[in-house]
Swiss-Prot record:
Biased composition (Polar residues): 1-12, 385-412
Record-given protein name: Somatostatin receptor type 3
Extracellular side: 1-45, 104-118, 183-206, 289-302
Compartments reported by the entry: Cell membrane
Species name: Mus musculus (Mouse)
Disulfide-bond pairs as recorded: 117-192
PTM note: Phosphorylated. Phosphorylation increases upon somatostatin binding.
Stated role: Receptor for somatostatin-14 and -28. This receptor is coupled via pertussis toxin sensitive G proteins to inhibition of adenylyl cyclase.
Self-association and partners: Homodimer and heterodimer with SSTR2. Heterodimerization with SSTR2 inactivates SSTR3 receptor function.
Keywords for this protein: Cell membrane, Disulfide bond, G-protein coupled receptor, Glycoprotein, Membrane, Phosphoprotein, Receptor, Transducer, Transmembrane, Transmembrane helix
Lineage of the species this protein comes from: Eukaryota, Metazoa, Chordata, Craniata, Vertebrata
């Protein structure tokens, strides 16, 4: 896994039978002792380090914007916003491992010590698994929202999403425990590696299968199943003439809600597809390297670099997807990035707000509808508590004095007094 390896661009004397990790370059690089080759490797190591640093800066800025938008410009975050916040936080922390990787590539050795090696690798592993687990939970949430919108309404709330997100972080920390135990800088070596006990080859193979199953293929199976069921549901719904839960009078509101759900689903699908595109080469190359060891020649350094760089590029590209596919994030980015120019334009004569597209109007309408639903839910909970108070007051045989507040007394049924009864009889 890319989060637990820090390959060097220089040849090493590492014995693959004693210390190995899941990155293919954690083996001896063969007989590449020519001066020209060593010079080329040193230059490529510096260039690769610069690329890593650029990706790190862009990723930190982009994910910081996402976190700021969710926390600052979202008064009542939705379920999807909670999961995106945790995904952005994982991507942000994932970016912090790039400077260490860049330093090892530029210096051709790990200068930070064994303890820092273990810490950095463990943190990267936690954030890698948190990313895929968050995407899996988001896909399950999309399945519930589209296939079971009514039954899942009580569970698809922001507090439940926060609890699930906390469980995701805990599960990721448990999964990477082998990294904490076996990572470090081997004796006589200057690179950060996984140090397996004997038989090292068996341990290494088991770890690759373990990380690939839990960190990619298992979650990918769940994600594909969720979207397969979503496609089946959408196709069956389009064949119906009328939606059973939507009357013709409410058709515009129902259509807006469906369009909003489709946009959210499209954004989640795009994020998942990008994750698969960036991570699948890495896991496939690791599995191929177990079955048939790959050549350890400088000619393959470009392939190895691409395989390790793609996962970091994925964390860097997620904020760009949010900006293109989500109106809420687009508006949040505009407020932050275009705030000075907006003040200047607002002072110009005849300047006005930009025209909104149909999708933007739908999303604003959906936000208002969600806020109204939350207010109605709070009102129903209050009425439920008041009805329980009323039932408790009328359950006893002896009438009890009313001790509720004035607002509660107005909502409780009032019994007619004797004067009211007399006046009613006189009218009869």
């Amino acid at each position: 896994m890319a989060t637990v390896t820090y390959p060097s661009s220089e040849p090493t004397t590492l014995d693959p039978g004693n210390a190995s990790s899941t990155w293919p370059l954690d083996t001896t690089l063969g007989n590449t002792s020519a001066g020209a080759s060593l010079t080329g490797l040193a230059v490529s190591g510096i260039l690769i380090s610069l690329v890593y640093l650029v990706v790190c800066v862009v990723g930190l800025l982009g994910n910081s914007l996402v976190i700021y938008v969710v926390l600052r410009h979202t008064s009542s975050p939705s379920v999807t916003s909670v999961y995106i916040l945790n995904l952005a936080l994982a991507d942000e922390l994932f970016m912090l491992g790039l400077p260490f990787l860049a330093a090892q590539n530029a210096l051709s050795y790990w200068p930070f010590g064994s303890l820092m090696c273990r810490l950095v690798m463990a943190v990267d592993g936690i954030n890698q698994f948190t990313s895929i687990f968050c995407l899996t939970v988001m896909s399950v949430d999309r399945y519930l929202a589209v296939v079971h919108p009514t039954r899942s309404a009580r569970w698809r709330t922001a507090p439940v999403a926060r609890t699930v997100s906390a469980a995701v972080w805990v599960a990721s920390a448990v999964v990477v425990l082998p990294v904490v135990v076996f990572s470090g800088v081997p004796r006589g070596m200057s690179t950060c590696h996984m140090q397996w006990p004997e038989p090292a080859a068996a341990w290494r193979t088991a770890f690759i299968i373990y990380t690939a199953a839990l960190g990619f293929f298992g979650p990918l199976l769940v994600i594909c199943l969720c979207y397969l069921l979503i496609v089946v549901k959408v196709r069956s719904t389009t064949r119906r003439v009328r939606a059973p839960s939507c009357q013709w009078v409410q058709a515009p509101a129902c259509q807006r809600r469906r369009r909003s759900e489709r946009r959210v689903t499209r954004m989640v699908v795009a994020v998942v597809a990008l994750f698969v595109l960036c991570w699948m080469p890495f896991y496939l190359l690791n599995i191929v390297n177990v079955v048939c060891p790959l050549p350890e020649e400088p000619a393959f350094f470009g392939l190895y670099f691409l395989v390790v760089a793609l996962p970091y590029a994925n964390s860097c590209a997620n904020p760009i997807l949010y900006g293109f596919l989500s109106y809420r994030f687009k508006q949040g980015f505009r407020r932050i990035l275009l705030r000075p120019s907006r003040r200047i334009r607002s002072q110009e004569p005849g300047s006005g707000p930009p025209e909104k597209t149909e999708e933007e109007e739908d999303e604003e309408e959906e936000e208002r509808r969600e806020e109204e639903e939350r207010r109605m839910q709070r009102g129903q909970e209050m009425n439920g508590r008041l009805s329980q108070i009323a039932q408790a007051g009328t359950s006893g045989q002896q009438p009890r004095p009313c001790t509720g507040t004035a607002k509660e007394q107005q909502l409780l049924p009032q019994e007619a007094t004797a004067g009211d009864k007399a006046s009613t009889l006189s009218h009869l």
